[in-house]
Amino acid sequence: MQISSSSSSNFFSSLYADEPALITLTIVVVVVVLLFKWWLHWKEQRLRLPPGSMGLPYIGETLRLYTENPNSFFATRQNKYGDIFKTHILGCPCVMISSPEAARMVLVSKAHLFKPTYPPSKERMIGPEALFFHQGPYHSTLKRLVQSSFMPSALRPTVSHIELLVLQTLSSWTSQKSINTLEYMKRYAFDVAIMSAFGDKEEPTTIDVIKLLYQRLERGYNSMPLDLPGTLFHKSMKARIELSEELRKVIEKRRENGREEGGLLGVLLGAKDQKRNGLSDSQIADNIIGVIFAATDTTASVLTWLLKYLHDHPNLLQEVSREQFSIRQKIKKENRRISWEDTRKMPLTTRVIQETLRAASVLSFTFREAVQDVEYDGYLIPKGWKVLPLFRRIHHSSEFFPDPEKFDPSRFEVAPKPYTYMPFGNGVHSCPGSELAKLEMLILLHHLTTSFRWEVIGDEEGIQYGPFPVPKKGLPIRVTPI
């Protein structure tokens, strides 16, 4: 095939005619590529890791966190590095944040970028189907179900049951020379959790077995996760298997009898999705165990601090007692028991609880994990790093709570600024049982302040951490009837 000279001439003429355009296009492409590379380099340089120390290899700063006063640990680093800093805790690189804006970002506005995370051993002990190990549709469904058990309409009928537990608890105190407040508050909070989980529909013998197995399980919660015969963790996991089997029997019995009412268990049994499918036995069991776990130690720790703060502030105790005596006189006059409505008319006592939650900050922080690289305030939070919103630092900031070390319930006469007060967390993973916790505190304080007096034994001050901050030795007290 031949190309005519005229055709060849036209082709090259056309090519040369387009040469300026091709050169321009080439230059534009090169410039764009160079600019893109420069932008990536600039972004990489700009988005540096937060300042901080990673501590010792593997151990990081874990020992310092769990042996020091957490306030001192957090404050030292915040003062040195600012509101966002890096560290290394429990074998994981972490970013700690201590401002309301950062906490809002992690827990609310960009919560989808941060998943809840727990040590694998904790997930095994509580159960992988428990709601606080999840996010997304499964978590949303479960949280809605659990919250429905702790709404005012569901809590109203429990007031009389909680009051009975309070009376039983307090009567056992007066028969002893002294008590360990924390231990007895754990028993009380645990009994309330069991009642909330099962209602009053189970045989006492069945509940006793469940209590025993759960207590055996709980003993190993903070142990080294070595699943070897003879270890505490192994014994706890064995109890976990037995507890699951016992719960399976209870679930099966309720299904067979068609009795799906009663406590959180009844709510979970009655749950159906759009295809009329219910929750599996393991999903129900894991969430029952999870709720009992979440409702026990933290509530008991706060109750212990309540008694400590009231004891240390006698004028405040007198004012609280006066408020409660007024309610008690009305109850006696009407010849009835304490009611839900009564607990809504305790403004001072409620503020004392709010201030205790702030001052004690039993939940010092929570764990999240970045599911992708996240930019915040000019820093890079790498994918896979743990992120810890520091509730304790926010609660003890003089910017949001003047004179933060002073115990002053009057500060709650005005609502705190958003995201400065988060004793139960915030966002989609906030504690669904917060109202139950406050209710059991109010009812116990009503009877304690109107029928008893207590004095702290010994003069040892300080805080012990294991894992929640509580007064040293669990606050030994002596209780006497009025």
Swiss-Prot record:
Binding-site residues, heme: C431
Bilayer topology term: Single-pass membrane protein
Lineage: superkingdom: Eukaryota
Pfam hit, one: p450
Subcellular location field: Membrane
GO MF term list: (+)-abscisic acid 8'-hydroxylase activity; heme binding; iron ion binding
Entry annotated with the keyword Plastid: no
Tissue: Mainly expressed in dry seeds. Lower expression in rosette leaves, flowers, siliques and stems. Not expressed in roots. Expressed in both endosperm and vascular tissues of embryo during the seed development and in cortex and endodermis in germinating embryo.
PANTHER family: ABSCISIC ACID 8'-HYDROXYLASE 2, CYTOCHROME P450 26
Name assigned to this protein: Abscisic acid 8'-hydroxylase 2
Species of origin: Arabidopsis thaliana (Mouse-ear cress)
